[in-house]
Amino acid sequence: MIYLDFINQQTTQTAKALLGVKIIYQDDYQTYTGYIVETEAYLGIQDKAAHGFGGKITPKVTSLYKKGGTIYAHVMHTHLLINFVTRTEGIPEGVLIRAIEPDEGIGAMNVNRGKSGYELTNGPGKWTKAFNIPRSIDGSTLNDCKLSIDTNHRKYPKTIIESGRIGIPNKGEWTNKPLRFTVKGNPYVSRMRKSDFQNPDDTWK
């Protein structure tokens, strides 16, 4: 599958390449789509901020050790977070999908979130709630389940910003490693200052 060739690269490379890719979730009643505007790379056994740090396999992180293209879904502070596993089976690396520029199904997203505007999908737990994604998707294979990506119908960022990941204190050198990737100026990026907002259309080539 083409999408697996896309996913099974070096994790930081995949995290950058996913920016602008179309993401689709189809439940029983609604199709939700959008474009990825923010990702974070997690580099497995060596990465002190990663769930795969140290290589210990527990029931909660089993999906992280599966083949590239597996969905690793976990809950943090009641929010469901979605990661795409990268690399080969047994290497617990992945990309966290942090924010989405919504496209299709915005009305339903507004209902699911009780929000509208840029707050709708500008965070890793916000977009999953907007898309109505259940935790049961953990361990599923991307594009072989209700969640998929489309690398053919995508956008391309004008500028990609690299920075330290969000909420990673006290992890030594890993706290500030530039493993967070964002579309510069896109107002759906999490924690962006309003003074840095651009028209979303102006952030793509």
From Swiss-Prot:
Q: Please give the organism.
A: Staphylococcus epidermidis (strain ATCC 35984 / DSM 28319 / BCRC 17069 / CCUG 31568 / BM 3577 / RP62A)
Protein family:
Belongs to the DNA glycosylase MPG family.
What InterPro entries does the record point to? Formyl_transferase-like_C_sf, MPG, MPG_sf
Q: Please provide, alphabetically and separated by semicolons, the GO molecular function terms listed in this UniProt record.
A: alkylbase DNA N-glycosylase activity; DNA binding
Which Pfam families does the entry link to? Pur_DNA_glyco
EC numbers, comma separated: 3.2.2.-
The yes or no answer to whether the keyword Hydrolase is present is: yes
Entry protein name: Putative 3-methyladenine DNA glycosylase
Q: Which UniProt keywords apply?
A: DNA damage, DNA repair, Hydrolase
- Alphabetical GO biological process terms: base-excision repair
Q: Which PANTHER family match?
A: DNA-3-METHYLADENINE GLYCOSYLASE
Instruction: Report which superkingdom the organism of origin falls in.
Output: Bacteria
